[in-house]
């Protein structure tokens, strides 16, 4: 017995829906990045997870909501973020002042709450630092000295433009 024309169309709709759902799921997994345990296992020697609320940087206990931080000495930058967790390179961080270390953590935390926009993450970081009293005007200038030489790229403005925007955020009472 052959299926009726209507049954064939219904079967095609079900098959296409399944393909679209699976494609959407694959895309979502790709966007979310690897789970923290998978990242840590693949990061190489020395990577470890610090649970939320247990990270201490230069005698400052810091957190990013309920998100853990991976300390990864093999990371090719000072910090990074995937949705749900932060990544810091302790070997690179030991070379910069405390205000810069805390700003880097807060910047990566900003991505958790403000998304991928770098300017919003910068603003989040300096406003958080000001509110939590670990970032002063002098500390902001240390951050600006740190990023000042940076060239812009597809995600970041050049260092001087980023500093100008961060100074405005630091001075503003509006939470951004």
Where are these regions (language model features)?
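N-terminal secretory signal peptides that target proteins for export/translocation
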Residues: 1-7
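Bacterial N-terminal signal peptides
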Residues: 11-22
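Sec/Tat signal peptide C-region and signal peptidase I cleavage site
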Residues: 24-28
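Catalytic zinc-binding patch centered on the HExxH motif and its immediate surroundings
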Residues: 55-84
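Short pre-active-site segment immediately N-terminal to the catalytic Zn-binding motif
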Residues: 88-103, 115
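Active-site recognition of the HExxH zinc-binding catalytic motif
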Residues: 103-112, 122
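An active-site-proximal "capping" alpha-helix that borders the catalytic cofactor pocket
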Residues: 116-132
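Long, well-structured alpha-helical subdomains associated
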Residues: 134-176
